[in-house]
Amino acid sequence: MIIVGGGIGGLAAALACGQAGARPQVLERAATFSEVGAGIQMGPNVTRTLHAWGLAQDLKEIGFVPRKLDAKDTQTGQIIGTLRLGQRSLDTYGAPYFTVHRADLHRVLLKKIRSSGQAELRLDSEVQGLQQNADGIQISGTNLPASLAELSQSAAMVGADGLWSKTRQFVVPPTAPRVTGLLAYRALVPMQSIPEKLRLQDVNVWVGPKVHAVLYPVKCGEYLNLVVVVQGPPPASLDDWDHAGNKQDLEAAMGPIHADLRNMLAAVPAWRLWPLCDRPPIKGPHEMAKGRIALLGDAAHPMRPFLAQGAGMAIEDAAELARSWARADLQVEDRLQMYAQARWARNAQVQQRSIRNGQIFHLQGPLRWGRNVAMKLMGEPLMDVPWLYAGP
């Protein structure tokens, strides 16, 4: 098995499939294995899988277990809903709710793969062409192992190369990702730099007219991860997804906000700006696998971050890919079709719900007040997502 892409999804696939006996080779086009970005939330559906891979202790050493998630109004500062996490996640779903920094999770996966010796990791390697026929697949590119020029009939390729995937074109007709009109300003600051009375032990989601902000501790509570999503035109270059963010532009886009939120954001010395892009929810298994080629994570189903499940769905994909690959009684094509059939509907549902959540977060006028009243009245049952956390 060849895995294209050495991010969180690619390494998760390598670890899971390596444990299933696949002996995967990971091809990463960068010169070093690294992960940039900010924090991620991992619901119990994700941590349950990571624990099954033997990473429970590793997660404790890098992550943070928030007690609860508070939803607040950006203008009044009032708590409009609370979802208990912490012990409730363990009692209800059998696994914890974690917040981590992407780079820390990436490092843990990389360390586990290297210590197991069950996968080969190759840097500075880029797949540029592929031919598939009844006998196998042939790959061309830069700095590839000679053995990849003629792959055996048992060979498969998994595209885990993200939103701007180069391998996606071998499964579905090439189309550009969709520009959402949303901008994410992200930052990571030492918790000590936040005013003491505002330091967090929980996840805070602030919702307001055309804006929302998500704040939570990472790195065992030593840092605060901040994400503010506003509406606005994208930067000129979308291929370069990470840009310097202008603080004045952010403040103008947010409009009036409560003093507590304003004081927390004031502790940020510099912002990074990410234009949010996605694709329409996938419509069937044919968008995740074709012949001996499969797609995983953002290469298959990029999603908006409003359900906090982008990395989670890639990790779930990896676990299902390993289960399907272990079916040695099936041909390679049938194993990949089994994987795609098992995953496409859940991924589509998460994509759809993520879009809907973003719309709810940004409601204005009477609809905003209606949302707030509904959340106050219904509280936890409205905020919990058992169909997601109890799965897959």
Label each PLM-derived region with a short phrase.
Residues 1, 18, 43-190, 234-253, ...:
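Conserved N-terminal helical subregion
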Residues 2-31, 158-159, 215, 249-250, ...:
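Conserved mid-domain beta->alpha element of the FAD-binding
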Residues 37, 53-54, 63, 83-84, ...:
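Short, flexible helix/strand-to-coil boundary loops that buttress conserved ligand/catalytic motifs
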Residues 165, 184-186, 211-214, 300-301:
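Histidine-centered metal-chelating micro-motifs
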Residues 201-236, 243-247, 251-255, 276:
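Active-site substrate-recognition segment that forms the wall
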Residues 239-272, 332, 340-341:
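Flavin-binding catalytic cores
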Residues 352, 356-392:
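Alpha-helical membrane-targeting segments
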